[in-house]
């Protein structure tokens, strides 16, 4: 199977209910954070019983941004066999453009993480 399941966890409540993200982590770091992207990628893989999972959390706008977390800030998490990578991104444009950029970046990160993992497993980290 290529796609086993997906979770849409827009609200903090759904992040807690569907993915079991702890309330104290959400309160400490906020929903748009490296820590939450990491927890989402970790938990999604466990719940789906899969080797690869991807998470995104961000502010697509047009509202919701702050000076510390502006519109366009996105964290993308990728979990490949328990190895989790999180990338911070800053995208420009309207809500639709930010969402499109997020999907493109998430797929690129997933590809990079899978290739890196299997390169290390197969070739000991050396390119063949």
Task: Give a label for each model feature.
Residues 1-128:
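Short alpha-helical segments enriched in small residues
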């Amino acid at each position: 199977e290529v796609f086993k399941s997906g979770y849409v966890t827009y609200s903090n409540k759904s992040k807690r209910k569907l993915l079991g993200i702890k309330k104290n982590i959400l309160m400490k770091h906020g929903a748009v954070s490296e820590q939450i992207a990491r927890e989402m990628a970790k938990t999604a893989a466990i719940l789906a019983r899969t080797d690869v999972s991807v998470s995104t959390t961000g502010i697509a706008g047009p509202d919701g941004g702050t000076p510390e977390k502006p519109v366009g800030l996105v964290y993308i998490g990728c979990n490949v066999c328990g190895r989790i990578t999180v990338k911070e991104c800053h995208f420009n444009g309207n809500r639709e453009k930010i969402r499109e950029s997020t999907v493109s970046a998430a797929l690129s990160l997933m590809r990079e993480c899978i290739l890196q993992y299997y390169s290390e497993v197969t070739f000991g980290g050396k390119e063949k």
